[in-house]
C-alpha cells in the first residue's frame, strides 16, 4: 500500500493543537519524510489559539535571517578577493533569492563554493547554510481554530500579503 509522504526540505509548518496535530504528527507514524540528503519539513506545534501568529513569526524570523545572509553574500560578491567561481555562485544565489526551488539549488552551489574560504563572512554564511534557501511557510489548523478561536490571527496573517500558506 502506498502512503502519502511530504518531504519538501524547504517546508516550514506551524501546526495548531487539535485534529491537525493528530493526523499531522502522531506516533508511531507521520506523513513527513526526508529526501536523499536526509532533509525534510520542519514541523512545530503551537497553542491552539495562536497558531497563525506562530507561523507568521516563523516566516518573519526566516525573512530577517535571510536578509542578513543576503547582505553578506552581496559583500562577498563585491569583494576583490573573491574568486570568479565564488562570485558566480553568489550571483546565482542573489538572482534566485525569491524563487523557491531554484534558490535551493543556488544555495547548495553557494555553500560548495564558499566551503573552505577563510574569511569570517564566508564562514558565517556556511555556518547558517540551513537558512539560505527560500522556505515555503505553511500554517495548518482545523475548523475550530480557523473559523472560531484563531480567526483574528488568520485574518491578520492573510492581510499581511506575505508569501504564506494556510490550510
List PLM regions with ranges.
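Catalytic or ion-translocation cores adjacent to nucleophile or general acid/base/metal-coordination motifs
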Residues: 22-56, 130, 148-167
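Core nucleotidyl-transferase/polymerase catalytic module
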Residues: 110-117, 132, 163-166
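Gly/Pro-rich turn-and-neighbor structural signature
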Residues: 1, 115, 119-126, 132-137
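A short, small-residue-rich loop immediately preceding and capping a beta-strand
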Residues: 11-15, 135-149, 164-167
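N-terminal leader/propeptide and maturation segments of large enzyme subunits in energy/redox metabolism
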Residues: 47-121
